[in-house]
């Protein structure tokens, strides 16, 4: 997305803003500083991004989110730390924390990053003259951060591949599926956390696929679960396949991310290898009560054993504990795909399964639990074409 002009980032539309709820609150109530007409005096001790403050100025009014949003993935970026702590060792934590602060923490979001301005990771700046919006504009908020993979897939920006049917036909926005409760880390009903007898706690999520799968395709397509939609493939495969196995098309993956600090400018930067197109089915690394599938789509994540080598050697000694081909939910769903053309589009087709020959030698051990050891054999008498 194109960056905003410097003046656009900070211009407050006084007339428009004063007519809103937040416009009836004094600037100093949120930003502190001094009540003075002199610019320099007024800006003394001012907090430019008050929703970042530990005092939690937003939660003084939005009390229902206090103590909840602070534990959400948007606020904590816990997914990063789950991976770093799993692959690292305690004695390397301080070094990794420094690297995290330099390179990863920009993805952290506060209330203001979604509801009044663009995220800091894309340069920031007000949406609309400091006017707060209850539902953020999708392409300037959600896909500003989740753009290189999810956004491009969903909006159909990957050349040669259509956008997701939910956007193309239904013009659905992210929040049509991902509710405010989910985005704020706020369960909306008991079953979102208490899903099975052995799962009776409500700890903050360790990563985005931790806990209950939400939303699910079946939330809007319940007949596919009940097996009453007269689609034989849904009945035959049942819960063995995630929906994306049949209804996703080619998506993007990327390889190692490497970080460093520029000797010239002193500023941190990162670089990733080239993005490439993939569609690979593997064994489900997140198999659970709510994700019972044997097979699911996998995406290569941008990490490598030496991602943080600028800061020290062997900082991730347990790198092989987690797969580099990870559980994926591509946002490019189609009714008809190459996989739905016939049974043997998948059965007996080695091109679409993650097999050991598709891995770099140094990645084999890390992905041993997601590699498909033997692909499903071709069937002699395919079931009738489900697309007909």
Where are each of the predicted segments found?
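Active-site-proximal beta-alpha loop/turn segments in soluble metabolic enzymes
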Residues: 127
């Amino acid at each position: 997305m194109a960056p905003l002009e410097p003046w656009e980032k900070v211009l407050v539309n006084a007339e428009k803003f004063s007519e809103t709820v937040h416009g009836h609150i004094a600037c100093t109530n949120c930003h502190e500083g001094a009540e003075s007409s002199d610019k320099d005096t007024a800006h003394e001790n001012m907090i430019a991004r008050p929703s970042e403050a530990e005092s939690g100025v937003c939660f003084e009014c939005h009390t229902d989110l206090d103590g909840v949003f602070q534990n959400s993935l948007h606020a904590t970026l816990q997914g990063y730390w789950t991976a770093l702590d799993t692959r690292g060792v305690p004695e390397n934590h301080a070094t990794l924390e420094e690297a995290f602060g330099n390179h990863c923490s920009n993805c952290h979001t506060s209330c203001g990053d979604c509801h009044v301005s663009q995220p800091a990771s894309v340069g920031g700046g007000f949406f609309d003259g400091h006017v707060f919006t209850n539902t953020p504009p999708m392409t300037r908020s959600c896909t500003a951060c989740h753009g290189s993979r999810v956004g491009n897939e969903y909006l159909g920006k990957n050349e040669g591949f259509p956008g997701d049917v939910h956007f193309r036909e239904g013009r659905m926005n992210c929040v049509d599926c991902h509710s405010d409760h989910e985005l704020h880390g706020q369960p909306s009903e008991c079953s979102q956390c208490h899903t099975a007898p052995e799962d009776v706690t409500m700890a903050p999520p360790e990563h985005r696929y931790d806990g209950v799968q939400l939303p699910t395709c079946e939330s809007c397509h319940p007949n596919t679960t009940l097996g009453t939609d007269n689609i034989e493939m849904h009945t035959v495969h049942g819960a063995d396949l995630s929906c994306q196995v049949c209804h996703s098309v080619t998506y993007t993956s990327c390889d190692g991310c490497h970080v460093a600090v520029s000797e010239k400018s002193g500023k941190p930067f990162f670089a990733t290898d080239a993005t490439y197109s993939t569609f690979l089915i593997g064994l489900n690394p997140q198999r659970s009560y709510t994700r019972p599938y044997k097979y699911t789509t996998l995406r290569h994540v941008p990490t490598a054993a030496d991602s943080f080598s600028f800061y020290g050697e062997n900082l991730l000694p347990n790198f092989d504990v987690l797969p580099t081909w990870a559980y994926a939910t591509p946002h490019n769903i189609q009714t008809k795909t190459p996989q739905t053309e016939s049974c043997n589009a998948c059965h007996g087709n080695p091109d679409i399964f993650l097999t050991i020959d598709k891995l770099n030698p140094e990645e084999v051990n890390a992905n041993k639990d997601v590699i498909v050891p033997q692909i499903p054999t071709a069937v002699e008498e395919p079931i009738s074409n489900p697309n007909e």
